[in-house]
Amino acid sequence: MPRHSRRYQEIRQKVDRTRFYSVDDAIELVKQTATAKFDETVELHLSTNIDTKRPEQQVRSTVTLPHGTGKRVRVLVFAKGDKAEAAKNAGADYVGGDELVEKITNENFTDFDVAIATPDMMRSIGKLGKILGPRGLMPSPKSGTVTEDVETAVKAFKMGRIEVRNDKTGCIHIPVGKCSFDGEKLRENLLSAYRQIIALRPAGVKGQFIKRVVLSSTMGVGIKIDQSDLENI
């Protein structure tokens, strides 16, 4: 069995693994147990009841956090002409057409967090699937990253829109802020993210969509949240 550090063991002792905490108590506890030397990210983990073998039950979309994630988001845009200028003016970090495709192909360049593309660029960037796909960076209409309105998309991702998708086990992991955020901002981000995911429930899912809700910091332990508290707020 893996041996955990003394710090991890001390954190674990503060969390009752059998208890389901209220939203406010979970946020307070995650802040108390975040003792790393950097500003840890607060992460919301949602265990869903989707059948990951069925394509129509995959969850892939975006959620917008009212207070952002606390992280500087690096946005790359594949566009030409006026669209490229609009992306630059909106604050995109990297903008280009075929030359940007070649840079990624030749240099394996992935020093960005979000990739947006205009529809006319999709044929050119199709060959980047093997590089961008595994990193979750491939533009997709489902995630709002293939669009003519690159200006709005760039601003939205810069201000707090994030891509979400389920993993192979059906879990969805969402950063909802930093431990340095005050409790109210974390609360509003968490509730907003949860409600937006609930609205994305695939039609074919049977029974309860969200089976378990857990909150943690980057280096912390999982804190289970009472879903009835989430539903009643």
UniProtKB/Swiss-Prot annotation:
Superkingdom assignment: Bacteria
GO BP annotations, alphabetical order: regulation of translation; translation
Record keyword Ribosomal protein present: yes
PANTHER family: 54S RIBOSOMAL PROTEIN L1, MITOCHONDRIAL, LARGE RIBOSOMAL SUBUNIT PROTEIN UL1M
InterPro entries to which the protein is assigned, alphabetical: Ribosom_uL1_bac-type, Ribosomal_uL1, Ribosomal_uL1-like, Ribosomal_uL1/biogenesis, Ribosomal_uL1_3-a/b-sand, Ribosomal_uL1_CS
SUBUNIT field: Part of the 50S ribosomal subunit.
Gene that this sequence comes from: rplA
Gene3D superfamilies on file: 3.30.190.20, 3.40.50.790
Family note: Belongs to the universal ribosomal protein uL1 family.
UniProt function note: Binds directly to 23S rRNA. The L1 stalk is quite mobile in the ribosome, and is involved in E site tRNA release.
Record keywords, A-Z: Repressor, Ribonucleoprotein, Ribosomal protein, RNA-binding, rRNA-binding, Translation regulation, tRNA-binding
SUPFAM superfamilies for the chain: Ribosomal protein L1
PROSITE patterns from the UniProt entry: RIBOSOMAL_L1
GO CC, any one term: large ribosomal subunit
NCBIfam families: rplA_bact (TIGR01169)
Identification of the protein by name: Large ribosomal subunit protein uL1
A GO term for molecular function: structural constituent of ribosome
